[in-house]
Amino acid sequence: MPVALRGPGLAGAATLLAAAVTAVVLAGFSLVSFPAYGNSNVLRALTVVGQTAAFTLVVVGVLCARAGERPGGRPALVRIGKLAAPTGSALLVAATLGIPLAASRLYLHGVSVDQEFRTQFLGRSATSLGLPDMAYADLPSFYPSGWFWLGGRFADLTGLEGWAAYKPWSILSLAVAAALVTVLWTRLLRTDLGAVVGVASTAVMLAYGSPEPYGAVVALFLPPVLILAWHAVAPTSRRGGRGATLATMLYLGASASTYTLYTGLAAGTVVLMAVVATAMAALAHRNAGRAPGRPLTQRPFPPRQFPPRQFPMWLPAARLAVIGFGSLAIALVVWAPYLVAALGGAPADSGTALHYLPDEGARLPLPMTAGGLTGWVCLAGLVWIVARAWTSRRAQA
């Protein structure tokens, strides 16, 4: 396969295709004055057609990848498959969100409830190259500005006002994220399995997370990044996992600049991974020292399952430090103004978001018990994780 379709090249091509697909859908449907989605079956039918085309594109990508990866297969088929699958995921986002909203310039739920401050925040970000607060002049923003700042630059580039840019920027960012996460899954798994997981993740995101686009972007990458994090803190060799360390650091830094709640979950999980990796490595070193003549395959952690003896015990902590300090440095780009003001006593010490706990935050989510298609899929995944936890590094992650 040409280098241009490996790693960053493939991600770049998928990003361009996702942007092109989204632009075609949004621009094309804006040329016709459609009735509101709830009052006509026309947009419903067109949405189904778009979704069917998206799933068909993913299936074509899977079939092409499988045919090309067989002995004697054509490399061109693999390239088509690797591009068709992420493009299908992006089209699924554009069709599911862009077509039903074609009759409106507003995003999901209009400007009601939380969408009011999100639209306002993007409007403020479009008027300044800095990091303004969503409501108050000359105050640093407590809410992470990363996604909104980029949305402001999108508004400047397209010549749209901030409130009008919120819908296309939301759909575009979700489509690009869906394409990139599909690319990442195809790199972590086989191309065909990665395509299926990528489009399934996109569908779940659309069903449950799309009203909060910046949070959905962060959540979409959380599962594959945690697999990379496990490779980072528990590599198969002393030199292995460096790329995974860099990817985890970049993700945590970007997520902290975008949505801190998911960042806390991800960071806590990575710390737990490092603790487990260190403990298992220490146990393996101790057992190996007690029985130096014992065959490696008879020791507690065979190389195919968990190879802690191939790296020193201090390596998980060192990798964790690199990830932690690196991600903090990235996050400070967005958080520094607020932290400087906080150290000076400027922000209020009451009535802020630090004192707010929503209903969802007081519950332990157990989607595998919810029933329905999503619940059954989550339950099947949980069973697989438990069954393969000892033999699969992905299940361990």
Annotate each language-model stretch with its function.
Residues A76-L139, A329-T352:
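Aromatic-rich transmembrane-lumenal/periplasmic boundary elements in polytopic membrane proteins
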Residues Y107, D114, P213-Y214, S255-R290, ...:
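Transmembrane catalytic cores of multi-pass membrane glycosyltransferases
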Residues M1-V21, V25-A103:
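Start-transfer (signal-anchor) and selected internal transmembrane alpha helices
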Residues L97-A219:
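Active-site lumenal/periplasmic loops and adjacent helix-entry segments of GT-C-fold
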Residues P2-L5, V59-G73, V225-T236, L272-H285, ...:
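Structural signal for the C-terminal ends of transmembrane alpha-helices
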Residues Q51-L57, A165-V181, L265-T269, G372-V386:
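Hydrophobic alpha-helical transmembrane segments
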Residues L5-V21, V78-A85, L193-G194, R239-T245, ...:
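Membrane-interfacial loop-to-transmembrane alpha-helix junctions, especially the N-terminal start
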Residues S89-V93, S173-T278:
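Membrane-embedded helix bundles of polyisoprenyl
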